[in-house]
């Protein structure tokens, strides 16, 4: 890789560290190309990305940002990142259960070092979409109750008229 390309890649990684709220580093040795592609697709669907990184360049990018130095950059490493806190840990841990050769080695949350325990805790949280769905269903409860209450007299009237017609016959 040319020196100019390396500098460009370091700037790219610095941008990821600055802008992504959650970064999870994975050791992907032993995964097939198809498996990595599937992980990328699932991450992309949820608004996240996966990038294979060169360890020395990743270390330089982390050092430039004055983030606490971590020893997660050794061996074949990829980083999954997103602005959403929950998406990346959920997807990566689901694939880690599915593919034993995929190992989560650490990460960053809000530019602070995250342990495996931190990542597991984030993955256990509900997504923002489920929170939005719960909120919307709560908003619908009064509307449903109003519809039921306003509809009840009509149903009673129809029942009375039906009984009246049946008694006349």
UniProtKB/Swiss-Prot annotation:
Claim: Thylakoid is one of the keywords in the record: no
Listed GO MF terms: large ribosomal subunit rRNA binding; structural constituent of ribosome
Keyword Ubl conjugation tagged: no
One Pfam family, short name: Ribosomal_L10
InterPro entries registered for this protein in UniProt: Ribosomal_uL10 (IPR001790), Ribosomal_uL10-like_sf (IPR043141), Ribosomal_uL10_bac (IPR022973), Ribosomal_uL10_bac_type (IPR047865), Ribosomal_uL10_CS_bac (IPR002363)
UniProt keyword annotations, A-Z: Ribonucleoprotein, Ribosomal protein, RNA-binding, rRNA-binding
GO cellular component, one term: large ribosomal subunit
GO biological process: translation
Coiled-coil portions: none
Described function: Forms part of the ribosomal stalk, playing a central role in the interaction of the ribosome with GTP-bound translation factors.
Subunit comment: Part of the ribosomal stalk of the 50S ribosomal subunit. The N-terminus interacts with L11 and the large rRNA to form the base of the stalk. The C-terminus forms an elongated spine to which L12 dimers bind in a sequential fashion forming a multimeric L10(L12)X complex.
HAMAP family cross-referenced by the UniProt entry: Ribosomal_uL10 (MF_00362)
Family: Belongs to the universal ribosomal protein uL10 family.
Record-given protein name: Large ribosomal subunit protein uL10
This protein's encoding gene: rplJ
């Amino acid at each position: 890789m040319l020196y100019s390309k390396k500098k460009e890649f370091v700037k790219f990684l610095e941008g990821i560290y600055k802008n992504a709220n959650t970064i999870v580093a994975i050791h992907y040795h032993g995964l097939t190309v198809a498996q990595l592609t599937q992980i990328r697709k699932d991450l992309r669907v949820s608004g996240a990305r996966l990038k294979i990184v060169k360890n020395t360049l990743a270390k330089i990018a982390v050092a430039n940002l004055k983030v606490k130095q971590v020893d997660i950059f050794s061996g074949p490493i990829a980083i999954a990142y997103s602005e959403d806190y929950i998406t990346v840990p959920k997807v990566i841990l689901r694939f880690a259960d599915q593919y034993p050769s995929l190992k989560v080695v650490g990460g960053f949350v809000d530019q602070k070092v995250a342990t495996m325990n931190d990542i597991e805790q984030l993955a256990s949280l509900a997504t923002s979409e489920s929170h939005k769905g719960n909120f919307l269903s709560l908003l619908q409860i009064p509307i449903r109750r109003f519809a039921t209450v306003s509809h009840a007299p009509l149903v009673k009237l129809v029942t009375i008229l039906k009984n009246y017609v049946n008694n006349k016959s």
